């Protein structure tokens, strides 16, 4: 695993955390928007669970053989969910006047970083795909602090995805700590 891929993944995690906490939670208060936000929240949850796998495994595990194909499918699925999210946001955010301008810029930067990460990850994926099928413990050649930071990010993004899924299901107290006028 290249160190560049790990650093780009960390940058993606930092920008993604900012996007989630500032735009999705604070500004748009998506979990409190009820049924109107459910489609967007479901997409966010799906992406979050994929990112939890990436953050939790890439710093530690080599995806050999068929597992390299599974990893490639996860990477492509994230792109598909992101594209669907772009379309879904238009209807969900209509009552807010659209997606915030800064949020659009944030999403563009995240797309660029993700693309760069995939580009530097492709040689490893190619090598891994030629190996016998196995998930092998192979800590990335980066500082241990970075590997453990990515594990913390895996936990954080998993919790965020669970929150979004909980809110999309409109379960009790899913809007905490927010309240909004849902008639907006």
Describe these PLM feature segments.
Residues 31-45, 97-105:
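Juxtamembrane helix-capping/reentrant segments at transmembrane boundaries
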Residues 18-39, 172:
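Membrane-interface helix-loop junction between the first two transmembrane segments
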């Amino acid at each position: 695993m290249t160190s560049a891929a790990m650093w780009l993944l960390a940058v993606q995690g930092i920008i993604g955390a900012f996007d989630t906490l500032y735009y999705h939670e604070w500004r748009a208060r998506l979990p409190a928007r009820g049924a109107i936000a459910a489609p967007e929240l479901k997409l966010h949850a799906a992406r979050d669970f994929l990112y939890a796998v990436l953050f939790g495994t890439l710093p530690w595990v080599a995806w050999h053989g068929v597992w390299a194909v599974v990893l490639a499918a996860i990477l492509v699925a994230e792109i598909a969910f992101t594209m669907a999210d772009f379309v879904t946001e238009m209807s969900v955010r209509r009552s807010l006047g659209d997606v915030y301008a800064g949020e659009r810029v944030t999403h563009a930067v995240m797309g660029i970083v993700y693309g760069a990460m995939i580009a530097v990850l492709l040689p490893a994926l190619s090598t891994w795909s030629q190996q016998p099928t196995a998930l092998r413990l192979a800590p990335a050649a980066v500082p241990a602090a970075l590997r453990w930071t990515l594990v913390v990010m895996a936990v954080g993004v998993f919790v965020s995805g669970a929150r979004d899924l909980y809110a999309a299901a409109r379960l009790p107290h899913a809007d905490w700590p927010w309240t909004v006028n849902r008639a907006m």
